[in-house]
Amino acid sequence: MTLSAVVAQFPVTLSIQRNLEIIHSVLEQTTPGDWVVFPEGALSGYSTDPIFLKQINQQELTTGLRHIQKESERRKINVWVGVCINQDGKWFNTAHGFCADGKTQVYHKINLANHERGVFSTGNHLPVFELNTPDGKVRVGIQICRELRFPEQWGWLARCGAQVILHLNNAVDDDSFQSVWKSHLISRAAETQRFVLSANNAAPKQVSPTIAVAPDGQVIGEIVSAELEILRVELDLSKVSNWYLDQSRSDIVAIKSNNIQNCA
C-alpha cells in the first residue's frame, strides 16, 4: 500500500482565524486520499509564554475545528492539526486527527516541556489510531515536539503496530540545535523502521526542519524555511518492518506500558 502525504509548515500565529485561513489554503491543494500533517498548535497558536492561553477564544477554536473536520470529510483526506484546548477546565496540548470517514481522533501530549508543566495537564496513554483508507487500514502513532527525545515512546508505538508516526512540532528561535533534532528524527525512524513525518512551525530559526524520513533512516524530503511550504511525499508501507524490533533482547530489557489499553 502506498500513502500520499502532505507535510505542511507555516508561520503559526496567535490568531485562530489567520491560522485557519492558511490551513484551509493548504487543504485546497490536496487530493482525495491524502494524509496532511500540520505543526503543534497550528490552529490555536502556540507560545512558550503560557499567557497566550488567555487569548484563546474557545468558541472560535471550536468553529475552526468543525471547519477542518468538514473539509476533511468533504475532500476525503486525513488531517492532523495541533491544538491547545481547554477540556473540562484543564488545558491540554493535543493533536486532533480528522478522518475522511468523518471520525475524529485526539492525542494528548504525555511528556510536557518545562514551560508547559503546571499549566497544561498531561495525557496518560500512547494510543495507536487505526484509520481507514481506500486501500485498507493504516495504523498511526502521534508525538508532539520534545517527545522526539524519548525513544521508548516511539518504540512502544511501533510495537503496538503503528506504521507511520506523525510528529507535530513547534520548535523555533535557536537553529544551533537543528542538526541534533534532525538526527533524533532520523534515529526514531531507523530504530523503529517506521515512516516519520514531522511538521515544524515556519520561522527564521527553526530548531528542527520539517522533514519526512523513511524506515531505513533515509531523508525523503526536508524543508528549512520561514515561509509557508508544503512537502509532498509517497509512503510505500511495504518498507515498514519489525526486523530490528524482533531482535530486541526483551528477556533483558523490555518496553512495557502501565496503561493496558494502549495497544487496544
Which residues does each PLM region occupy?
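C-terminal beta-strand edge segments of enzyme domains
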Residues: V128, N201-A264
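Short, acidic/polar
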Residues: R18-L27, L148-G155
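Residue-level detector of high-confidence beta-strand sites
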Residues: T94, V106-K109, H167, E222, ...
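Cys-nucleophile CN-hydrolase/nitrilase-fold catalytic domain and related Cys-dependent amidase chemistry
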Residues: I16, H24-A100, D173-A190
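Short polar catalytic/cofactor-binding loops
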Residues: Q9-L14
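Extreme N-terminal starter segment of soluble prokaryotic enzymes
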Residues: M1-V6
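CN hydrolase (nitrilase-like) catalytic-core segments centered on the catalytic cysteine
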Residues: E60, G64-N78, R149-L228
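Active-site catalytic loop in hydrolytic enzyme cores
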Residues: N86-C160, D173-S183, L245-R249
